[in-house]
């Protein structure tokens, strides 16, 4: 009987957790930043096969700093924390991203980025890769 009572008490506590977790939901605000199946220049996102590897980077670009031409083998996206970055693809497409913007990166398309402003640009990049693929390949 004691075992059954303990089981019931633990079960009730466990079942009450979800309601407790959202009891004060007015204190929590959720904002969808983006939802898409393609990158900013409309290339379809396809996840690679293999053992998963997630990488997150904080990138800080000084004013007027320019990235070398590069491409990504894996899907990635970024969130601009401060400043602006101007991205240009090898075909000449250009897009500016500023504080609060989500950047869905191009996959296997050469591109570069520049901080066109007079302040530091900071952004976080998340790569959804695999152990056998490089996140970024710098063009020589």
Residue ranges and their predicted role:
Residues 61, 91-108:
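Short acidic-glycine-tyrosine-enriched beta hairpin
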Residues 1-5:
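Positively charged n-region of N-terminal signal peptides that target proteins for export
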Residues 8, 17-53, 96, 104, ...:
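A short, N-terminal "cap"/entry segment at the start of jelly-roll beta-barrel domains
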Residues 55-72, 107-110:
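Conserved short histidine dyad/triad with adjacent acidic residue
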Residues 66-67, 84-88, 102:
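Short beta-strand segments in beta-sandwich/barrel cores
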Residues 71, 79, 116-120:
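Extracellular/periplasmic catalytic domains that process cell-envelope and extracellular macromolecules
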Residues 74-91:
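Glycine- and acidic-residue-biased ligand/ion/polar-headgroup-sensing regions
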Residues 108-133:
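Ligand-binding loop in jelly-roll beta-barrel domains
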